[in-house]
UniProtKB/Swiss-Prot annotation:
<keyword id="KW-0204">Cytolysis</keyword>
<feature type="propeptide">
    <location>
        <begin position="24"/>
        <end position="35"/>
    </location>
</feature>
<comment type="subunit">
    <text>Homomer of four to six subunits.</text>
</comment>
<dbReference type="GO" id="GO:0031640">
    <property type="term" value="P:killing of cells of another organism"/>
</dbReference>
<feature type="propeptide">
    <location>
        <begin position="65"/>
        <end position="71"/>
    </location>
</feature>
<comment type="function">
    <text>Female-specific peptides with potent activity against Gram-positive and Gram-negative bacteria. They have as well hemolytic activity.</text>
</comment>
<protein>
    <recommendedName>
        <fullName>Ceratotoxin-A</fullName>
    </recommendedName>
</protein>
<keyword id="KW-0964">Secreted</keyword>
<keyword id="KW-0044">Antibiotic</keyword>
<dbReference type="GO" id="GO:0005576">
    <property type="term" value="C:extracellular region"/>
</dbReference>
<keyword id="KW-0391">Immunity</keyword>
<keyword id="KW-0732">Signal</keyword>
<keyword id="KW-0165">Cleavage on pair of basic residues</keyword>
<keyword id="KW-0354">Hemolysis</keyword>
<feature type="signal peptide">
    <location>
        <begin position="1"/>
        <end position="23"/>
    </location>
</feature>
<keyword id="KW-0929">Antimicrobial</keyword>
<dbReference type="GO" id="GO:0042742">
    <property type="term" value="P:defense response to bacterium"/>
</dbReference>
Length: 71
């Protein structure tokens, strides 16, 4: 289940970082882009941790139900 939490964290961080980098940056914009990604990561990590704490119990409860449906 720790892997599930890590996947949520990575997806949320990647989504927010992608929103900061809409177009391919020019060489002079690289510093601005790096700062944008850095600030997005700093803001995304606490949010992702909160979502992971909420989603993990839901996933644990849904897993036996899904396993019963599949097998």
């Amino acid at each position: 289940m720790a892997n599930l939490k890590a996947v949520f964290l990575i997806c949320i961080v990647a989504f927010i970082a992608l929103q900061c980098v809409v177009a391919e940056p020019a060489a002079e914009d690289s510093v601005v882009v790096k700062r944008s990604i850095g600030s997005a990561l700093k803001k995304a990590l606490p949010v992702a941790k909160k979502i992971g704490k909420i989603a993990l119990p839901i996933a644990k409860a849904a897993l036996p139900v899904a396993a019963g449906l599949v097998g």
